[in-house]
Amino acid sequence: MVNTNNKNITLRALEPSDIDFLFDIENDINLWKYSNRSTPYSRHLLLDYIKNSSKDIFESRQIKFAISDSKNVPLGFIDLYDFEPMHRRAAIGLVVDNSKRSMGIGSLSLELIELYAKNQLFLNQLYANIASENKSSVSLFKKHKFIQSGKTVSYTHLRAHETR
């Protein structure tokens, strides 16, 4: 478990009790445009995902942590995915519940995952693919000294996810 005393934010393994929160986050159509989703996940599929989340990152090439407060209430999720141990790199995915944004939770979580990646996995590169329209996420990663190394043009069709 990755832990910090600062504001009692913890990154912890997924638990079956996280299913409702995970279901709501993964099926929030307002977030799909940032995750390349276009269809909902079933509760059954997400329960299977939680059950299989104990696989080692070297086997599954990904790991998802629940971000929780001091009472173990989930606030969001942070992932390492596209894990490449030979090249010592991974991508980061981060989502904080809408009602908990702008409270520093994303920043604290990013600090913790960076420490975990460096000290436990010995990674030397973390990256994130962020839509330029996602200003708060771009700002967060810049604050943490991530460098914009490229810009894809017409890569993500965000309007495809707009509700009519």
What would you call each of these model-derived segments?
Residues 1-47:
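A short, well-structured alpha-helix characteristic of acyl/acetyltransferase catalytic modules
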Residues 43-93, 97-99:
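Acetyl-CoA-dependent GNAT
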Residues 97-99, 103, 132-133:
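Active-site acidic-Proline motif in GNAT/NAT acetyltransferases
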Residues 103-116, 139-143:
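Conserved acetyl-CoA-binding loop-helix of GNAT-fold acetyltransferases
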Residues 120-129:
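Conserved GNAT acetyl-CoA-binding A-motif
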Residues 128-138:
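Conserved beta-strand-loop-alpha-helix junction that forms the acyl-donor binding cleft
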Residues 142-152:
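Conserved acetyl-CoA-binding loop of GNAT-fold acetyltransferases
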Residues 156-163:
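Conserved small/polar residues in nucleotide/adenosyl-binding loops
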